[in-house]
């Protein structure tokens, strides 16, 4: 079964269909309580490094390079990515993030890796 991996902003309401919800931001999102976030896990270890996050600064023009650099950082966490892949093969996994841009963010990159076999 192909992994069922989704991405969702932490500011959007949690839904039962989200399955296992994992936040991958290094910093807690502003204005969101832990209760409202309804997370199963806060995986700070899977977030981009502070240096990479600051360099990217959510600039879509930098996204291609950000994507490559973040993928390089994630190579140190293949075991964690494998854990998410296994979990997603048994039910939905929603990678939760705080960025406004729904197409150019760390969750999109991580979801690609989790979906890859």
Residue ranges with predicted function:
Residues 1-117:
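Residues lining hydrophobic/aromatic ligand-binding pockets adjacent to catalytic sites
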């Amino acid at each position: 079964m192909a992994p069922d991996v989704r991405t969702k902003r932490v500011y959007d309401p949690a839904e039962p269909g989200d399955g296992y919800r994992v936040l991958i931001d290094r910093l807690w999102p502003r204005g969101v309580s832990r209760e409202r976030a309804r997370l199963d896990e806060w995986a700070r270890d899977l977030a981009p490094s502070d240096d990479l996050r600051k360099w990217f600064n959510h600039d879509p023009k930098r996204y291609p390079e950000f994507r490559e650099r973040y993928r390089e950082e994630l190579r140190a966490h293949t075991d964690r990515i494998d854990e998410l892949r296994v979990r997603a093969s048994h039910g939905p996994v929603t990678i939760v993030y705080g960025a406004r841009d729904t197409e150019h963010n760390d969750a999109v990159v991580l979801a690609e890796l989790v979906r890859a076999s």
